[in-house]
């Protein structure tokens, strides 16, 4: 009976580790393309106008009702993007 319990425990834990590994890669981003960036830049994502929150900086969190809350870009000309390894943020010209 103890062997059966160990086998069942391994069968329960093993799939979780594979799921976590795949989930971690998906969150960090893949090098094949930036599908999330394209998703965020579509017109129906409820992107709000960026507000001054970090003066003088070209990087910050972007205003998105479902994603970033009240954290905003430094300038109104910035657009919301997804940067690999840095997460959601702003892309500002110049």
Curated annotation (Swiss-Prot):
The cellular location(s) given in this protein's UniProt record come to:
Secreted
Q: Which UniProt keywords apply?
A: Acetylcholine receptor inhibiting toxin, Disulfide bond, Gamma-carboxyglutamic acid, Hydroxylation, Ion channel impairing toxin, Neurotoxin, Postsynaptic neurotoxin, Secreted, Signal, Toxin
What molecular function does GO assign, one term?
acetylcholine receptor inhibitor activity
Taken from the UniProt record, the cysteine pairs bridged by disulfide bonds within this chain are 63-72, 68-80, 73-90, 78-92
Organism's domain of life? Eukaryota
Q: Does the keyword Secreted apply?
A: yes
Which stretch is the leader sequence?
Answer: 1-24
Q: In which tissues is it expressed?
A: Expressed by the venom duct.
Gene Ontology, cellular component aspect: extracellular region; host cell postsynaptic membrane
**Does this UniProt record's set of keywords contain Membrane?**
no
Give the pro-peptide residues. 25-45
Question: Where are the 4-carboxyglutamate residues found in this chain?
Answer: 46, 49
Q: Indicate where the modification 4-hydroxyproline is found in the sequence.
A: 55
Identify the main location. secreted
Q: What does this protein do?
A: Alpha-D-conopeptides act on postsynaptic membranes, they bind to the nicotinic acetylcholine receptors (nAChR) and thus inhibit them. Through its two C-terminal domains, this homodimeric protein would bind to two nAChR allosteric sites, located outside the nAChR C-loop of the principal binding face and at the adjacent binding interface in a clockwise direction. This toxin specifically blocks mammalian neuronal nAChR of the alpha-7/CHRNA7 (IC(50)=0.25 nM), alpha-3-beta-2/CHRNA3-CHRNB2 (IC(50)=2.8 nM), and alpha-4-beta-2/CHRNA4-CHRNB2 (IC(50)=28.6 nM) subtypes.
Show the domain comment: The cysteine framework is XX (C-CC-C-CC-C-C-C-C). Displays a mini-granulin fold, a structure composed of two short, stacked beta-hairpins connected by two parallel disulfide bonds. This newly described fold is derived from the same cysteine connectivity as knottins (ICK fold). The name 'mini-granulin fold' comes from the structural homology with the N-terminal region of the human granulin.
Q: Which family does it belong to?
A: Belongs to the conotoxin D superfamily.
What is the annotated quaternary arrangement, including any partners? Hetero-, homo- or pseudo-homodimer (identical sequence, different post-translational modifications).
Q: What is this protein called?
A: Alpha-conotoxin Cp20.3
Q: What is the lineage of its organism?
A: Eukaryota, Metazoa, Spiralia, Lophotrochozoa, Mollusca
């Amino acid at each position: 009976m103890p062997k059966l319990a160990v086998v069942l425990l391994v069968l329960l834990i093993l799939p979780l580790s594979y799921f976590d590994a795949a989930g971690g890669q998906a969150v960090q981003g893949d090098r094949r393309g930036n599908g999330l960036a394209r998703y965020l830049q579509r017109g129906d994502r409820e992107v709000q106008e960026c507000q001054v929150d970090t003066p003088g900086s070209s990087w910050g969190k972007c205003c998105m009702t479902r994603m970033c809350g009240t954290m905003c870009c430094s300038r109104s000309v910035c657009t919301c993007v997804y940067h690999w390894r840095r997460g959601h943020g702003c892309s500002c010209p110049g």
